[in-house]
Regions:
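Conserved helix-turn-beta segment immediately C-terminal to the redox Cys motif
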Residues: 45-47, 64-83
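Structural microenvironment flanking redox-active thiols in thiol-disulfide oxidoreductases
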Residues: 85-93
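Non-catalytic, surface beta->alpha helical segment in thiol-disulfide oxidoreductase systems
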Residues: 105-132
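Short pre-active-site segment immediately N-terminal to redox-active cysteine/selenocysteine motifs
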Residues: 45-46, 52-56, 99
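Conserved redox-active cysteine motifs that mediate thiol-disulfide chemistry
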Residues: 52-66
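A short beta-strand-turn-helix
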Residues: 30-48, 89
Length: 132
């Protein structure tokens, strides 16, 4: 009963679900912080998408679930993360981020693309695919 209730509640949030060893898990974007940015983003050998967002930002709340869906779909092919700009001011300052949501795309430690403002999932997927 609890499983079905949880499944219904999660579907309301459109969180991506995956099966692992016959157990349903939620695959979401990684939390990117000032402390782990270098390791997870700059040293990654995979394409990386980082969504810079804040809790109070309306458009960020639209983009957030899309980023989680991309994390589920790309799995181990790309690193998909989110950075809360209120909790981690260093990275946004380093990259001159003044508007949110801003999504930065990295490959081999280099910034290769940028999306400022909300964008459809297909646009973000195209930008990731260009660097796979």
């Amino acid at each position: 009963v609890i499983y079905h209730w949880l499944k219904i509640k999660l579907s309301e949030f459109r969180l991506p679900l995956q099966k692992l060893n016959n157990q349903t898990i939620i695959k979401m974007a990684l939390e990117i912080t000032d402390q782990n940015f270098e390791e997870l983003v700059m040293k990654s050998d995979k394409p990386v998408l980082v969504d810079f967002w804040a809790e109070w930002c309306g458009p960020c709340r639209v983009v957030g679930p899309v980023v989680d869906e991309l994390a589920a779909e790309y799995g181990d092919k790309a690193v998909i993360g989110k950075c809360n700009v209120d909790h981690n001011p260093g990275i946004p300052t380093q990259f001159g981020i003044r508007n949110i949501p801003t999504l930065l795309f990295f490959k081999n430690g280099e910034l290769v693309d940028k999306q400022v403002g909300a964008a459809p999932k297909s646009i973000l997927a195209d930008k990731i695919n260009a660097h796979l």
